[in-house]
Amino acid sequence: MAAKFGVHFTVVKVGKYKSYTETYTEDKMSDANREQVSRYIGGLWQQMLADVSKSRNISKDSLNRYADGLMVFDDAQLLKSRKMVDGFCYYDEIRDVVKRQLGLKTDETINQVDYNDVDMAIDDSNLMGEEIAVYYCQGAIVRMETPSIYGSEQQIVSTKVIKDLQELADNSQVKAVVLRINSGGGDAYASEQIWRAVKELNKKKPVVVSMGGMAASGAYYMSMGAQYIMAQPTTLTGSIGIFGALPDFSDLMTKKLGFKYDEVKTNRNSAYASAGMSRPWSAEEITTMQNYVNRGYNLFRKRVAEGRKMSTEQVEKIAQGRVWLGTDAKNIKLIDGFGGLSDAIDKAAELAHLSSYQAVEYPALAGWMEQLMDMAGGNKGTYLDEQLRLALGDLYQPFIMIRNMKEKEPIQAALPYVLNIQ
């Protein structure tokens, strides 16, 4: 579509599975991308089948048959007869169901909490002892914070993360650190800088990475400085590769809009900054950018080899930008073990030889009053952001992804798409 407006893209990348740039250049999936997506979507489905089969005591064959038949649109009574649900009730009746489960009388009260308030809750039953810091890294990896009217958009800002990790390294009360990462990656340079900060922190105290639903590409890169990596079987990780998309607006600017350009320069490449605006990218410029990407990929591969104690040849076999599901990642040694955040905290305590410990969140989560003031005052576009979420639904994340394209650094270590599993 962009070509219709006179906008073209030149792709520089390493890794046949690094498919982000297909957004700019192709009208369908490449065979390599279809291969990796089929693999991890199939793996996610098999994990879901196993979990539901065990929980509901329903055979996997039956579940597959239900899925094929669009059971979601069947009569609700069928859901019960097929053991997919236990019963039916209206919203106002759910409290009585919970009370029965808790052994409470119907006239007794129960406290309720919004799921957002417990989404990142930590088991704090042990509030005494040495501190284990839990540091949250969520969103796209960037060099500097980019102000946005879309307020709730989270970022991993390398300058801030480095400063925070240095402070944790110097904090004598903190005996170990858990990095809770949920990110599809981002700026390759920023990922390298955070990697070093993690590595330097790990020299002073154990660092354990706890991967959420996604810790891929640049997010995996920064994890290589840690001592131990934990993920879930359904985590998307790996994606060891780098790409760049060089936009060329010259047709739009000169032919469709009629702008005229001229230049005076002292050296052959003095006018490098005009590439893609007043003229197309030259062959020399494209080759230079490809070499730049190649060096970035080789460095990424080296960091993985060092962090995972592999040879570069071993890394190359599982790299090429391929995204791996947690179950596969464990088998090919991209991660050390399975577990959630509480398991990662326990592992950090073990590595730090702590028998009594408490988890402390960094950066500290905003208090309820601060959140209330943000909502009331529309701080950082929170109100607009929420309205966009409501209006766009599943299209919200792709919208943010497209909006961010113009702000990205040219060389990226990022997951190639927004994943929406339905």
Question: Across the structure, where does each feature detected by a protein language model lie?
Answer:
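Charged, glycine-interspersed solvent-exposed loop segments at helix/strand-loop junctions
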Residues: 2-97, 250-332, 336, 342-348, ...
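Short, well-ordered loop/turn and helix-capping segments at boundaries between secondary-structure elements
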Residues: 4, 200, 213, 228-231, ...
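Extracytoplasmic
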Residues: 4-7, 47, 61, 66, ...
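C-terminal long alpha-helix characteristic of the crotonase
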Residues: 54-55, 86-131, 301-307, 336-378
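Cleft-lining beta-strand/loop regions that shape enzyme active-site pockets
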Residues: 125-252, 294
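Intrinsic disorder and flexible/low-complexity segments
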Residues: 129-132, 136-171, 364-422
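Active-site proximal loops enriched in glycine and acidic residues that flank catalytic Cys/His/Asp
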Residues: 136-139, 181-183, 211-213, 233-235, ...
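Short glycine/threonine-rich loop-to-helix capping motif typified by GTGT followed
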Residues: 188-193, 328-331, 371-376
